[in-house]
Amino acid sequence: MSLAKLRTHYTADVKPEKVDNGQKITLAGWVHEVRDLGGICFVVLRDREGKAQVTLVKKKIDKELFDAARRLVRESVISVTGSVKFEEKAPNGYELLPEEITVLNVANSPLPMDTTGKVEAELDTRLDSRFIDLRRAETTAVFKIRHQALQATREYFVQNGFIETATPKVVATATEGGTALFPITYFDREAFLNQSPQLFKQILMSGGFDRVFEIGPIFRAEEHDTRRHLNEATSIDVEVSFADHFDVMEILENLVAYVYAQVIEKCKPSLETLGIELKVPKTPFLKLTYNEVIEIINARSEEKMHWGDDLGTFGEHIVGNYVYETTGESHYFIIDWPTEIKPFYAMPYEDRPEYSKSFDMMHRTMELSSGAQRIHIPDLLKSRIESQGLNPEGFEFYLKAFEYGMPPHAGWGMGCERFIMTMLGTENIRDTVLFPRDRRRLSP
């Protein structure tokens, strides 16, 4: 059977400006609900774009068709051909008066979980039966928004002269020298799943690519088991030649504002489904120095932060709330971090080398992005690698790119899932991933 016979329209396509009253159409999807009232039967058909009411009046329709509709099993796959009747009280403002209902696949009963929203399910239950959970309107809405956010991200980069790249995910050495790596067997050698495209982005700067971005998977073998950590995630990465950290911060904040604006414009039904009202963040974002952050935390907490400490969850909450209370905005930057707590490739200030030209972009109580101007001077880079207890020989492929004309450059990486999580106010980062991989979950 051809696609044209199974479906001519999505449910959301049936509008007075597109479809005539009485026009014959074919919808296809899942049986969301069956309401049998004796003399009348309502079948709610659900597809990717929404729901449509199929109305069968016993006295006006073939008995065999009426009885078949009453027997439909929830979540079975059907195709319905009939005539459109615009009706204000019906879902989406119309109902379909069927001439033919074809059952394409019958669902087992009972279902592993409810899809109507009448019965709540725990996240683990939903993830165990993800194929059913993805049929829920709220779940679908999240991934439609994620799709639009990534599409807008690509649009923004292309409009601003970036080249999209794809770097290796199987590597011979750690990107940042950490131990949080997944080892794999690569024929007769040990290899790792890449934790960041960082080193390859910088090599591309030596290659003259000038402005690059990548949207791809990263892998972190960290044993965190929290609502905001994943072991496989999607990273949005940027690298720009002839730029410093302030230049790429501007690119980042403008990207965030652009994506929000596009989601607001193009995802109205999904935002309504989730009950969310977004506003475009104001740019430029507030910039706080690391030292200012220490002062803010220590003035508001008995638990003190000392120079050289990372921010920590408690500090993120204090500073994020301070920024929101004073500016009404959620996004902000923390700049000028101590050199020793940033990766080896972060450029130190010439006049105060204990500080680096680095930044984190925050959203209230969560880090979304980390970036810096990079070291482009070979001797300094090698020295920084050694100072962090790493062997430069393991980075030979990377260091060579700096010996034959590396321009000054800067960049950042941002976690896609955290970006979506904070945009939508999602409680758990796993809600923003189709099939999340965390410390405890490897299936489905």
Curated annotation (Swiss-Prot):
It catalyses: tRNA(Asx) + L-aspartate + ATP = L-aspartyl-tRNA(Asx) + AMP + diphosphate. L-aspartate binds at residues 176, 220, 370, 374. Binds 3 Mg(2+) cations per subunit. The strongest magnesium site (Mg1) is bound to the beta- and gamma-phosphates of ATP and four water molecules complete its coordination sphere. GO terms for cellular component: aminoacyl-tRNA synthetase multienzyme complex; cytosol. Its main location: cytoplasm. Mg(2+) 3 binds at residue 367. InterPro entries: Aa-tRNA-synt_II (IPR004364), aa-tRNA-synth_II (IPR006195), aa-tRNA-synth_II/BPL/LPL (IPR045864), Asp-tRNA_synthase_2 (IPR004523), Asp/Asn-tRNA-synth_IIb (IPR002312), NA-bd_OB-fold (IPR012340), NA-bd_OB_tRNA (IPR004365). It is found in: Cytoplasm. ATP binds at residues 220-222, 228-230, 367, 415-418. Mg(2+) 2 binds at residues 367, 370. Residues 198-201 are annotated as: Aspartate. PROSITE patterns: AA_TRNA_LIGASE_II. Keywords: Aminoacyl-tRNA synthetase, ATP-binding, Cytoplasm, Ligase, Magnesium, Metal-binding, Nucleotide-binding, Protein biosynthesis. One of its GO terms (biological process) is aspartyl-tRNA aminoacylation. GO terms for molecular function: aspartate-tRNA ligase activity; aspartate-tRNA(Asn) ligase activity; ATP binding; magnesium ion binding; RNA binding. Its EC number is 6.1.1.23. The record marks 91 as: Important for tRNA non-discrimination. Its cofactor is Mg(2+). The keyword Transcription regulation does not apply. Aspartyl-tRNA synthetase with relaxed tRNA specificity since it is able to aspartylate not only its cognate tRNA(Asp) but also tRNA(Asn). Reaction proceeds in two steps: L-aspartate is first activated by ATP to form Asp-AMP and then transferred to the acceptor end of tRNA(Asp/Asn). HAMAP family: Asp_tRNA_synth_type2. Belongs to the class-II aminoacyl-tRNA synthetase family. Type 2 subfamily. Homodimer. This is Aspartate--tRNA(Asp/Asn) ligase. It comes from Methanosarcina barkeri (strain Fusaro / DSM 804). The lineage of its organism: Archaea, Methanobacteriati, Methanobacteriota, Stenosarchaea group, Methanomicrobia.
